[in-house]
Amino acid sequence: FKGADGYFHLYYLLNSNYKSDNDGTEWYHVRTRDWEHFENQGVAIPKFTHGWSAVATGSVIDNASGFFKDLPTAAIVAYFTSYTESGQHQYAAYSLDFGKSYVPYNGGQPVLKGTTATSDNRDPYIWHDAARGKLMMYLAEGDKIGVYASSDGKAWTYEGATILSAGALGGKDLGLVECPNLKTMKASDGTTKHVLFFGANGYQYGSTTGTYYMVGHLDDKNVFVAESQPRRVDQGTDWYGANFLQESDTTVKALAWLGNWAYLQGDIRDQNGEVSKHLSGISMTRNLTLVREGGAYVIKSAFVNGNPKTSV
């Protein structure tokens, strides 16, 4: 998010004790002014505190609109998944110090519980529909993205889903879907489209895990309706769990986790056999734009402050 302090603020999942605590991630906070130089700010949402367990992916939203009536307009509200013995539940917390630390919201209780102990219900993406006066949640649910609405940010009702099963995609699915994100973008021809980003597995298409997108529109319940088949944002094997920030109606900033669970389950060693203290990193930041090309709308990316020749 872009803070009132003049910085852009980002979070990534950190597990500093991954060898002995393999599932214990928490939110680590960094900030930047130029998207090239980042300042560490420490852990913002710690694991195993305030009633939640490990802290997984989520999103943040500011309260500039005053939607959260019981919070100051300067508050930043985070929604995130926590893995518990009873399932994957969605929690919320708020910050009053530019995202450096967070206080449990809703009394530290889940705002939305997983359907069963073993079901996939995670990675909430939150956005505000000012016209309806609702807060919307996109939630990764196996082979679909569930859509929920709330009038207070605490109680949620199911509105529908974007199905990403084999049947919906013409016979080939994308495996487990994660990290949904929705952006509204004006294309090169002046048309405004909704773009749904998500993480998935392209093994049935001869590819690996990666970040995908579909171009489409929203129905009257804010459920995304695809007008195109999924495409990859990046063809590499190490661009996953992406973060997106809307810079303007034509440009979205994006960066992602440089990692792949196909080889990150164990140690990474150098030529001398020394074990790395880090399993992965964060990619360079890109500017994403939507271009009309060959009768379709496609995402183009170029590195921030980079040479145009590096565009893909």
Where are these predicted regions, by residue range?
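Beta-rich carbohydrate-recognition and catalytic domains
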Residues: 1-123, 128-173, 186-235, 258-311
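A short, structured loop/turn motif at beta-sheet edges
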Residues: 187, 246-250
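Signature of short aromatic-glycine-proline-rich micro-motifs recurring in repeat-based ectodomains
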Residues: 56-61, 179-182, 241
